[in-house]
Structures are given as structure tokens and as C-alpha cells.
């Protein structure tokens, strides 16, 4: 895939179906727990520091943010789940917004579910992964923050995540460091198979 990383922009921040952009391009959604590093992942994949706003404070992304990647595909940054300080009403609102997008959006071809390599997946991670599998939505699990784990222990942590999510053979998982941009090309190659 030959992407001009200077030609990337945020099209819209949407909260309902009527606001989704009509581009006809393939969409890749990024899902994960609050503060798992979705925005940092987007920025590192497109070689920008601040295209997707990052925050130390969980729960900052509250809309579906559609990023046009060089007129070739759209990254959709989805609100993080599992943040305890968000009210129950707000969590339900996010849940409905995400469910509507994931189950009804024809342009959606792949979901990248991010999990923190340092920790065992939460029940929310397991629920989201099972939800995606239930609807037969192609999913790539990215284990973020690989640089925070000693190199010799990475495979052990990946196995723990595979076991908790009950990944089967043929399910896809890649560990990644946004600092080192490790395996960036492997991830782009995977995404390209859905475009």
C-alpha cells in the first residue's frame, strides 16, 4: 500500500448514523478499553504526532472519529469502553452508538481491537471480542505497549491474551510498540487485504 501520509485528515466526529461520511471507502475501526492507546496507535501508524488527540485521562474520545487516510481508507477511532468514571447513562449511550456503527455500517471491513500487552484482557475486552466474532466481523487483535515488556516475556504475555480471549487458529494477533513502530508494515499488509 502506497500512502501519502501528508494527505490525512479528520473528516467528522459523529455520534449517529446520519452523520457518517459518505466516502465509499473501506473503514477500519479501532476498538479497545479506555487508555489502551488507540489514538497513539493511529498516530504512530500514520506517522503523525497529534492527528488523533491523545490524553492521559481515560474516556476522552466520546465520538466516532473518522480519519481519511489518503483517499484509500478510513480509520474510525471508537470511544473506549470500561472506564468506570463514565456514568451508566453515558456508557449506555456509547454502547448504542458503537453497536449501531459496528452492526449496520456496510463500509466497515475490519475491526482492530487493541489490548494492553502488560495485562490480562478484562471482561470488557472478552465481551467485545466475542461480540465481533458473533457478528462475523473480521478482527485483528493488536497488543499495545510491547516496549513495556521485556523481550523474552512478550510471547508469554501474548499467550495469556490468546487464552483469555479464546483465540482459535486462524484468529489474528500482533504485538506492537507505538514507540518503536515495530511490525507497522505487517499491520499495513494485513489491513491492505481488506481494501
UniProtKB/Swiss-Prot annotation:
Residue intervals of the EngB-type G domain:
24-195
Q: Work out whether the entry's keyword set contains Cytoplasm.
A: no
Q: Does the keyword rRNA-binding apply?
A: no
Q: Which Pfam families match?
A: MMR_HSR1
Q: What superkingdom heads the lineage? A: Bacteria
UniProt binding sites for Mg(2+): 39, 61
Q: What Gene Ontology molecular function terms does this protein carry?
A: GTP binding; metal ion binding
- A single GO cellular-component term on record: cytosol
Q: Which GO terms describe its biological process?
A: division septum assembly
What does the entry list as the binding residues for GTP?
A: 32-39, 59-63, 77-80, 144-147, 176-178
Regarding protein family, the annotation reads:
Belongs to the TRAFAC class TrmE-Era-EngA-EngB-Septin-like GTPase superfamily. EngB GTPase family.
Lineage at the top is: Bacteria, Bacillati, Bacillota, Bacilli, Bacillales
Keyword annotations from UniProtKB, A to Z: Cell cycle, Cell division, GTP-binding, Magnesium, Metal-binding, Nucleotide-binding, Septation
Q: Which cofactor does it need?
A: Mg(2+)
**Its biological purpose:** Necessary for normal cell division and for the maintenance of normal septation.
Recorded protein name is Probable GTP-binding protein EngB
Gene3D superfamilies recorded for this chain?
P-loop containing nucleotide triphosphate hydrolases
Amino acid at each position: 500500500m502506497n500512502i501519502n501520509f501528508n494527505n490525512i485528515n479528520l473528516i467528522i466526529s459523529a455520534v449517529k448514523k446520519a452523520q457518517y461520511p459518505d466516502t465509499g471507502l473501506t473503514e477500519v475501526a479501532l476498538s479497545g478499553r479506555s487508555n489502551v492507546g488507540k489514538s497513539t496507535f493511529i498516530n504512530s501508524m500514520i506517522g503523525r504526532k497529534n492527528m488523533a488527540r491523545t490524553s492521559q485521562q481515560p474516556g476522552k474520545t466520546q465520538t466516532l472519529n473518522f480519519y481519511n487516510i489518503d483517499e484509500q481508507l478510513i480509520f474510525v477511532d471508537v470511544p473506549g469502553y470500561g472506564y468506570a468514571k463514565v456514568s451508566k447513562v453515558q456508557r449506555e449511550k456509547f454502547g448504542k452508538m458503537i453497536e449501531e456503527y459496528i452492526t449496520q455500517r456496510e463500509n466497515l471491513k475490519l475491526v482492530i481491537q487493541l489490548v494492553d500487552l502488560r495485562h490480562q484482557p478484562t471482561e470488557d475486552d472478552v465481551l467485545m471480542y466475542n461480540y465481533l466474532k458473533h457478528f462475523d466481523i473480521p478482527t485483528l487483535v493488536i497488543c499495545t505497549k510491547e516496549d513495556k515488556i521485556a523481550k523474552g516475556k512478550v510471547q508469554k504475555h501474548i499467550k495469556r491474551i490468546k487464552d483469555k480471549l479464546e483465540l482459535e487458529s486462524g484468529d489474528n494477533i500482533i504485538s506492537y510498540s507505538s514507540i518503536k513502530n515495530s511490525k507497522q508494515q505487517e499491520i499495513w499488509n494485513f489491513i491492505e487485504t481488506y481494501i
